Design a protein with these regions (language model features):
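Short coil/turn segments that connect the beta-strands within blades of beta-propeller domains
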Residues: 1, 50-52, 95-97, 143-145
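Hydrophobic alpha-helical segments and helix pairs
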Residues: 1-41
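Short loop/turn segments immediately following the C-termini of beta-strands
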Residues: 7-9, 57-61, 103-105, 141, ...
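Structural motif
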Residues: 10-19, 62-67, 106-112, 155-170
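Short loop/turn segments that connect beta-strands within beta-propeller blades
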Residues: 21-25, 69-73, 113-117
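A short beta-strand motif characteristic of beta-propeller blades
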Residues: 26-36, 74-81, 118-126
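Repeated scaffold domains used in trafficking and secretory/extracellular systems
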Residues: 36-48, 84-93, 129-140
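Loop/turn-rich, solvent-exposed surfaces of beta-rich toroidal or solenoidal domains
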Residues: 83-114
Length: 170
């Protein structure tokens, strides 16, 4: 299944989770997200199959993760984050933690414990002026990289897919 956040750009009246069939790309199910918690849309979402949730946040200075039921897509709860995380662009579960990429001043990557909400900055990317930090995926590769993060260049005519090693404490 493919899970996606859909927005009515710059209006945010119909912020939606949609589930697509990966073979046909047809929408199979959708639900409106919590407008109370998805202030200025839903710039990203992440599936946590182990705990049965889909996570998202508001765009600016997110005070909490917003958890939706993986099967029904209904709002379940919020999880307070220990420090606001600004402009999250994408995230993925790796082990029991959520890693998120931002488009904040340093395009930082953060680790968030989804059970406690404890957030810590892993590293800054410090991209060229005008670049935009985008999404991230987690996948162990033979060269030791774990986090793979996308960024767009200042003129949006080039994209970089950067690979980072990161040791997760047990």
């Amino acid at each position: 299944k493919i899970y996606a956040a859909l927005e009515d750009s710059k209006v945010w009246n119909y912020v939606t989770i949609c589930v697509f069939n990966p073979e046909t790309f047809k929408a199979e199910k959708y639900a409106t997200m919590s407008l109370e918690h998805q202030v200025k849309g839903a710039p990203w979402l992440c599936v946590d199959a182990e705990n049965g949730y889909i996570y998202s946040t508001q765009r600016d200075n997110a005070p909490c993760l917003v958890a939706y039921d993986l099967e029904t897509l209904e709002f379940v709860k919020t999880i307070s984050i220990s420090q606001p995380v600004h402009k999250i662009q994408g995230g993925e579960m790796y082990g029991s933690d959520l890693f998120v990429a931002t488009n904040n001043d340093t395009q930082a990557v953060y680790r968030i414990d989804v059970l406690t909400g404890e957030a810590e900055k892993c590293f800054d990317r410090n991209l060229a002026t005008g670049s935009e930090g985008e999404g991230l995926t987690a996948l162990e590769t033979a060269d030791g990289a774990v986090l793979h993060v996308l960024d767009m260049g200042p003129l949006f005519v080039n994209a970089n897919f950067r690979h980072y090693s990161y040791e997760v404490e047990a």
